[in-house]
């Protein structure tokens, strides 16, 4: 079975959390006989769609994961960021016929909750690998 080549888009905002997510994602990818071959760091979750699109255009990338932590603030900004980014990210998967998995925690969570949810990175890798392999089975 071919090793799945994954591109990762990682938010720099809350980097203490997203860096842990990236390391966990790399480790889990190896466990699943996949590899994170390319990483693009972006300022925040809202900035992810353009980087996701760039990775989807690369022939050497089979699937993409997004890693971010959106922590609740004094306004509804966290809700808006996650809703808009996740919608556009899902649209890109459909537009480019490649799996894109969300490893974004939030909205509406505290910093402590974000630290407790770093395993969303593993879920994203798992979803990306499963989707890639299942879509290839039908060809």
UniProtKB/Swiss-Prot annotation:
Purpose of the protein: Catalyzes the formation of 6,7-dimethyl-8-ribityllumazine by condensation of 5-amino-6-(D-ribitylamino)uracil with 3,4-dihydroxy-2-butanone 4-phosphate. This is the penultimate step in the biosynthesis of riboflavin.
Class of enzymatic activity (EC top level): transferase
Pathway recorded for this protein: Cofactor biosynthesis; riboflavin biosynthesis; riboflavin from 2-hydroxy-3-oxobutyl phosphate and 5-amino-6-(D-ribitylamino)uracil: step 1/2
Entry's family note: Belongs to the DMRL synthase family.
Source species: Methanothermobacter thermautotrophicus (strain ATCC 29096 / DSM 1053 / JCM 10044 / NBRC 100330 / Delta H)
Coiled coil start-end: none
InterPro entries per UniProt: LS, LS/RS, LS/RS_sf
Alphabetized UniProt keyword annotations: Riboflavin biosynthesis, Transferase
Pfam families membership: DMRL_synthase
Protein name per Swiss-Prot or TrEMBL: 6,7-dimethyl-8-ribityllumazine synthase
Gene Ontology cellular-component terms listed: riboflavin synthase complex
Catalytic site: 77 (proton donor)
Binding-site positions, (2S)-2-hydroxy-3-oxobutyl phosphate: 74-75, 117
Positions with a binding annotation for 5-amino-6-(D-ribitylamino)uracil: 13, 45-47, 69-71, 102
Any GO MF annotation of the entry: 6,7-dimethyl-8-ribityllumazine synthase activity
EC numbers, comma separated: 2.5.1.78
GO biological process terms held by the UniProt record: riboflavin biosynthetic process
Catalytic activity: (2S)-2-hydroxy-3-oxobutyl phosphate + 5-amino-6-(D-ribitylamino)uracil = 6,7-dimethyl-8-(1-D-ribityl)lumazine + phosphate + 2 H2O + H(+)
């Amino acid at each position: 079975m071919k090793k799945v080549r994954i591109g990762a888009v990682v938010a720099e905002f809350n980097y203490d959390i997203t860096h842990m997510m990236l390391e966990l994602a790399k480790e889990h990818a190896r466990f699943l006989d996949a590899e994170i071959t390319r990483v693009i760091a972006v300022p925040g979750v809202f900035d992810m769609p353009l980087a996701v699109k760039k990775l989807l255009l690369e022939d050497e990338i089979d699937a993409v994961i997004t890693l971010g932590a959106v922590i609740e603030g004094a306004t509804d900004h966290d809700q808006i960021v996650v809703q808009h980014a996740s919608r556009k990210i899902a649209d890109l998967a459909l537009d480019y016929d490649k799996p894109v998995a969300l490893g974004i925690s939030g909205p509406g969570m505290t910093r402590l909750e974000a630290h407790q949810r770093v395993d969303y990175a593993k879920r994203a890798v798992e979803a990306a690998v499963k989707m890639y392999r299942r879509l290839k089975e039908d060809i």
